[in-house]
Amino acid sequence: MNILSRCLMALSRKSRMSIKDVTFSSEGALYTIVISSSTIEQMVSECLKAGVNETGGILIGSYSEDSSTAMIVEATTRPADSLAGRTTFQRGVRGLRPLLHARWKTGLYYVGEWHFHPGGSPEPSGDDFRSMTSIAANSDYQCLEPVMIILGGDPAGSYSLSASVSPRGDAPIRLREVLI
């Protein structure tokens, strides 16, 4: 085993030990998002593979009975037909339909999108918000309030997350991390 492999294994063990579930909420708790630690691990792993390029995928999860809380349990890898560069990411669709159909059978659904801003802030860009507004308006997604999670920074070191929800017909709403 070479040194790089040992370092990646050590980083992987460290990440699993230190990553916890993260909760974001809007003022008045109208919208709440809970991201599982395994979902964050999936995103960090994909970001490490992407290096200096943006990457992303879809978010899969379920909703509370009153639909006020999205519980995110999976972040997919980027579809093979995605386009990515240093400052751009356009998610493809290859393989998503059968994946979502399989998850739907287990009570899980498309809840939104995630992507990576390498070395940068997790703040959503105007393009990010326009994309989510378009998804909210598109009935094909069957998601009235899609979530957007952005991981920014260095996934091997210091990174942070942002969360937004885009209610159909309204402006996107930035959520704040709930510190427990």
Curated annotation (Swiss-Prot):
Induction notes from the record: Part of a CBASS operon consisting of cap4-cdnD-cap2-cap3.
The entry's keywords: Antiviral defense, Hydrolase, Metal-binding, Metalloprotease, Protease, Zinc
Keyword S-adenosyl-L-methionine: no
Binding site for Zn(2+): H115, H117, D128
Matching SUPFAM superfamilies: JAB1/MPN domain (SSF102712)
UniProt GO MF annotations: metal ion binding; metallopeptidase activity
Annotated ranges, domain MPN: 33-165
Location of the active site: E54 (proton donor/acceptor)
Record-linked InterPro entries: JAB_dom_prok (IPR028090), MPN (IPR037518)
Disruption of the gene: reported phenotype: Essential for CBASS function; when the operon missing this gene is introduced in E.coli it no longer protects against phages T2, T4, T5 or T6.
GO biological process, one term: defense response to virus
Superkingdom in the source lineage: Bacteria
EC number, UniProt record: 3.4.-.-
Membrane-crossing segments per the record: none
Presence of the UniProt keyword Zinc in the record: yes
Job description of the protein: Metalloprotease priming reversal component of a CBASS antivirus system. CBASS (cyclic oligonucleotide-based antiphage signaling system) provides immunity against bacteriophages. The CD-NTase protein (CdnD) synthesizes cyclic nucleotides in response to infection; these serve as specific second messenger signals. The signals activate a diverse range of effectors, leading to bacterial cell death and thus abortive phage infection. A type II-C(AAG) CBASS system. Reverses the primed state of DncV, the CD-NTase. Cleaves a CdnD-GFP (green fluorescent protein) fusion protein precisely at the C-terminus of CdnD. Overexpression decreases the efficacy of CBASS protection against phage T2. Antagonism of phage defense upon overexpression is CBASS-system specific, Cap3 from this bacteria only antagonizes its cognate CBASS system and not that of C.freundii, E.coli or V.cholerae.
Family under the similarity heading: Belongs to the peptidase M67B family. Cap3 isopeptidase subfamily.
Protein's recorded name: CD-NTase/cGAS isopeptidase
